[in-house]
Amino acid sequence: MGSYKYMETILIPAFILLLSLNYVMPCNLTVNFYDKTCPKALASIKRSVWAAVASNPRNAALLVRLHFHDCFVQGCDASLLLEGAGSEKASPANDGVLGYEVIDAVKAAVERVCRGVVSCADILAVAARDATVAVRGPSWTVRLGRRDSTTSNAAEAVTDLPRGNMNLNQLIDNFRRKGLNAREMVALSGLMCFFVLPLYY
């Protein structure tokens, strides 16, 4: 239990940082974007995400990783979810990314509540938050109103996403191009430890 408390002191700044990335968030986002058009959307997302995490706690990490990979290429626009040759999803940079079926199930649940209203980009953002809360991580306010991309580029995923074989200077440069400094890079890079390590102990 103590390790969770310790991790919260690291996670809260990391998530605030992730959410404050100006390059991925348009100015017109609001917390009440779906209040009139789909008032049950957030409850539906939460229910689906919590069920997925209850069935397999690893799903929390998968959802956060999906959101990170989506936001790091073209911004938080759900371009990672687009399929086809030459798409981000098909890029070698996203070979190890899992959890698409969880997002598909969440999207299906939202569509049953209000068809064609809630963007996949917003579903990814809210699902990452709800998954974090489901494993006793911090919560934060998610501003809504993102639009889904109609384009996806595998080459951009290769050039934009940090890779495991990058040295320190390359990683710092990679994050710097996204407006992040070395300290912020460490916070975001270490974020997955919170999700993955407790599953092994």
Where are the predicted features?
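Folded extracytoplasmic luminal domains of secretory or organellar precursors
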Residues: 2-201
